[in-house]
UniProtKB/Swiss-Prot annotation:
Keywords: Cell inner membrane, Cell membrane, Electron transport, Flavoprotein, FMN, Membrane, Phosphoprotein, Translocase, Transmembrane, Transmembrane helix, Transport. It is a multi-pass membrane protein. This is Ion-translocating oxidoreductase complex subunit D. Coiled coil: none annotated. Part of a membrane-bound complex that couples electron transfer with translocation of ions across the membrane. The chain crosses the membrane at residues 19-39, 41-61, 66-86, 87-107, 122-142, 212-232, 236-256, 265-285, 291-311, 315-335. The modification FMN phosphoryl threonine is found at T186. Belongs to the NqrB/RnfD family. Its cofactor is FMN. It comes from Haemophilus ducreyi (strain 35000HP / ATCC 700724). HAMAP family: RsxD_RnfD.
Length: 348
């Protein structure tokens, strides 16, 4: 028997796998930029993450008596693996991304019932778990390669990830020993801990900054921005979430900068020195864990911008995107409940 469904009975060509494939394509420019400025470690992390995704999806399919490729065909696991691999430090130990993929796919996705059922963004659940559980490994970012006397080769990247040392016996921390002014994980970390003493002008004179922008991070964020605009053009994502998120964050940051007189990085530095563009276009726009109503998307995006601002400026973690997205995910059922569009023909 056929299941009765309401009309119109039209076939949509935009399958889940097609949407996911466009997201992957949109992340390729940022992946290339990350390799160029931060090395080939991200390629190895991505390979590990993809391998784990394939294994986990096959195991879960078998446990649920599905076909082997049942959970692989939609490419959702591939997108999660790509986001997580690009979010963690390129030279983090191999077991970090392996644990992260287990948390992302098993705990944050399949324990909720699989694709379309999860309350939280799986990649951000894994990232937050890793950051809390392994803070040293998750803050082991190397600066842009132009600051390193001997940038790690692919062989060195492999050895750093699997053995913790390069072919010359250097750890990732030792690779920084010849660079003055670098004592923290990322430009946002460095600025947060030193701006009170050095001031804004002193911070941007650090080697990790080129003008008001962090070396490598500006190009990476521009690549994510380009990919996000491509997704908007292809109508894979909606404009409300990234626009609301960036506008709210920018306005609050600008007002704070006016009031506190350069005790924080300025708005442009904040937008292009961390994961803001990555979060706005590729993380916050997750179609499952984000709001689904037009007004709800604006509220959801604005809430992420507000939370990211509060955590960055007044919290202990300088980037804040993961925690802001997860906290906003908690509010999605409430947001959707109160922002349902009025049915045609009904009274306001």
């Amino acid at each position: 028997m056929f299941k009765m469904v309401s009309s119109p009975h039209t076939h949509g060509t935009n399958l889940t796998a097609k949407f996911m494939l466009w997201v992957i394509v949109a992340m390729l420019p940022a992946l290339i930029v990350q390799i160029a400025f931060f090395g080939t470690g991200v390629v190895i992390q991505l390979a590990i993450a993809l391998s784990m995704a394939i294994v986990i999806e096959i195991v879960v399919a078998k446990l649920r008596h599905k076909s082997t490729t049942f959970y692989l065909a939609d490419l959702a696991g591939v997108v999660t693996a790509t986001i997580l691999a690009m979010a963690i430090p390129p030279y983090a130990p191999y077991w970090v991304v392996m644990i992260g993929m287990i948390v992302a796919l098993l705990l944050a996705k399949h324990c909720y019932g699989g694709l379309g059922q999860n309350l939280f963004n799986p990649a951000m659940v894994a990232y937050a778990f890793l950051l809390i559980s392994f803070p040293v490994q998750m803050t082991s970012w190397l600066p842009s390669f132009e600051l390193l006397a001997e940038p790690p080769t692919f062989k060195d990247a492999w050895l750093l990830i699997f053995k913790g040392v390069t072919s010359d016996g250097f750890t990732s921390r030792q690779l920084l020993s010849g660079i003055d002014g670098i004592a923290q994980a990322t430009p946002l970390d460095s600025a947060k801990t030193s701006i009170a003493k050095l001031g804004f002008d002193g911070v941007i004179q650090s080697p990790i900054f080129s003008g008001i922008f962090a070396r490598g991070w500006l190009q990476l964020n521009l690549a994510f921005l380009a990919g996000g605009l491509f997704l908007l053009y292809k109508r894979i994502i909606h404009w409300q979430i990234p626009v609301a998120m960036l506008v709210v964050f920018s306005v609050l940051s600008a007002l704070t900068d006016l009031v506190t007189m350069h005790t924080h990085l300025n708005v442009l530095s904040q937008l292009f020195s961390g994961a803001m563009m990555f979060g706005a276009f590729f993380i916050a726009t997750d179609p499952v864990s984000a709001s689904i109503t037009p007004k709800g998307k604006l509220i959801f995006g604005g809430l992420i911008g507000l939370l990211a601002y509060l955590i960055r400026y007044y919290g202990s973690y300088p980037d804040a995107i993961a925690f802001a997205v997860l906290l906003a995910n908690l509010c999605v059922p409430l947001i959707d409940h109160y922002t349902q569009p009025r049915l045609y023909g009904t009274h306001k």
